[in-house]
Design a protein with these regions (language model features):
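N-terminal accessory beta-strand-rich subdomains and adjacent acidic, glycine-rich linkers
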Residues: 27-284
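Bacterial Sec-dependent N-terminal signal peptides
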Residues: 1-27
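Intrinsically disordered, low-complexity acidic regions
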Residues: 240-242, 283, 322, 334-344, ...
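Conserved, mostly hydrophobic/aromatic
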Residues: 139, 328, 416
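Aromatic- and carboxylate-enriched substrate-binding clefts and catalytic-loop regions
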Residues: 339-444
Length: 444
């Protein structure tokens, strides 16, 4: 009888402690392989996901918000943690070219699987990877009945830095990313482009950026609050013309949001966190990928001694290009880039980019003959493709143009988008622009 009573009491205690155990699982930590960086992730009492980062006993990022807002609902609160999953990887991979041949990819991973407690009970996973010299995280929208096609209207991602460190940044401009770099405290910044290079203290340098941007809007950040002397940066994405930020369909993954962490500024140059967060190269045979220096016909246009458009000062002529090819061959340059060779420059090309033709050369420019001449000298032309921002016109000619260049033995193309907008309405760094750049890469 007494044994039965104790058994019942034990069961009651177990059930009483079960909610506490479940609450304890609403937060977890993951450390880098050496243990020097530790990331904590979880959800608060309102079900809002967050993360923080420490280096040893030093706080780098205070609890910072995570999540998304959609056109038909919110994915930034009312969550519970379904489970935490862990993984680790330690591998070496080889670059076709770069500062070093072999790169070590060593990290510990924590996946926080979330489900909303009410309403549609949508699911969202957040994957964290912690390296010895930085960390990254991304959002994963799993396949689910309650989420098919969706539109992101705001990304709630924040980086809440300890203190108000100084940073080198480029100001955000919807048309061009060509401002001047400035150094100032984060609290004094407006909306800025990434990367954001941060000097927190003499032995703490960081770089905030993104990785694996394939079908998403480009990341910018801006300070949204300074509380207790700590600055909070929030993600600001480049929109479509109608205000949408990202158009997607589950299953779907976001780019990585990343922070490299170094003791010295120079360490940011050799930091490989961003490279390691990108997908492995999809090109199986990379033996043909080589580096090379080039010269070209373009600076004389800016000096106003020659012109892009045909006329008495036309720079892209057969005779002039041969001079550059001879110079390149004599001085060890592998390529010659020629601007103004193709039809379209005779128009107001900043407004009429849709009139560019990427296979038809001006009469005074022997395109195929010049490439044969260059090859005989151990040099090659680089095809210059200025679009004037007319992305659709370029996409419609990609197959024909690239087939011609390949047939001629041209191995490199330099594209251009000199315009505030793409196709007269979309920002170059929006999802629209990112999708276009991917089409060009894949066609090449």
């Amino acid at each position: 009888m007494k044994t039965e009573r104790f058994k019942n009491l034990f069961l009651v205690l177990c059930f009483a402690l079960l909610p506490m155990a479940m609450m304890a699982k609403q937060e977890a930590t993951v450390s880098s392989p050496s243990g020097n960086l530790t990331l904590t992730a979880g959800v608060d009492k309102a079900g809002r996901p967050y993360y923080s980062l420490r280096r040893g006993g030093e706080v780098i990022l205070l609890p910072s918000a995570l999540g998304m807002k959609l056109k038909d609902g919110s994915l930034d609160s009312d969550f519970r943690v379904v489970t935490f999953a862990r993984a680790t990887k330690d591998e070496m991979w080889r670059q076709p070219w770069g500062e070093e041949v072999d790169v070590r990819n060593h990290y510990n991973e924590l996946t926080m699987k979330l489900a909303q407690k009410k309403g549609l009970q949508r699911q969202l996973n957040i994957v964290f990877r912690v390296f010895d010299d930085g960390m990254g995280f991304r959002y994963v929208f799993p396949e689910q009945k309650q989420l098919k096609d969706f539109v992101i209207t705001d990304e709630a991602t924040e980086f809440c830095f300890k203190g108000d460190p100084e940073a080198w940044t480029l100001p955000y401009d919807a048309g061009y990313y060509e401002g001047l770099w400035t150094k100032d405290h984060l609290s004094k910044k407006g909306k800025v482009c990434t990367p954001v290079t941060i000097e927190a203290k003499p032995d703490l340098y960081m770089m905030l950026h993104e990785a694996n941007l394939t079908d998403y809007s480009s990341l910018n950040v801006k300070p949204v609050e300074t509380k207790d002397g700590n600055v909070r940066l929030k993600a600001e994405l480049v929109p479509w013309s109608n205000g949408d930020l990202v158009r997607a369909k589950a299953p779907f993954v976001s780019p990585w949001r990343m922070l490299s962490v170094e003791n010295k500024a120079g360490g940011l140059v050799t930091n490989r966190v961003m490279l390691n967060l990108n997908d492995p190269c999809k090109i199986k045979d990379i033996s043909w990928i080589t580096t090379g220096k080039y010269v070209g016909v373009w600076w004389s246009y800016h000096m106003q001694t020659a012109t892009w458009a045909p006329g008495p000062k036309h720079g892209a002529t057969t005779e002039n290009t041969k001079r550059y090819i001879d110079f390149a061959a004599q001085h060890g340059f592998k390529g010659v880039l020629v601007e103004g060779w193709n039809y379209g420059w005779e128009n107001d090309w900043g407004k009429e980019g849709d009139k560019f033709n990427f296979t038809k050369a001006y009469p005074d420019y022997d395109f195929e003959g010049l490439q044969k001449y260059a090859l005989s000298k151990g040099v090659s032309l680089i095809a210059h493709n200025e679009t004037g921002g007319a992305a659709k016109n370029y996409e419609n000619q990609l197959e024909e143009a690239f087939s011609l260049y390949e047939k001629m033995g041209i191995k490199a193309v330099k594209t251009g988008y000199v315009n505030n907008l793409m196709d007269d309405k979309e920002h170059q760094h929006s999802q629209y622009g990112v999708r276009h750049y991917r089409k060009v890469i894949e066609a090449a």
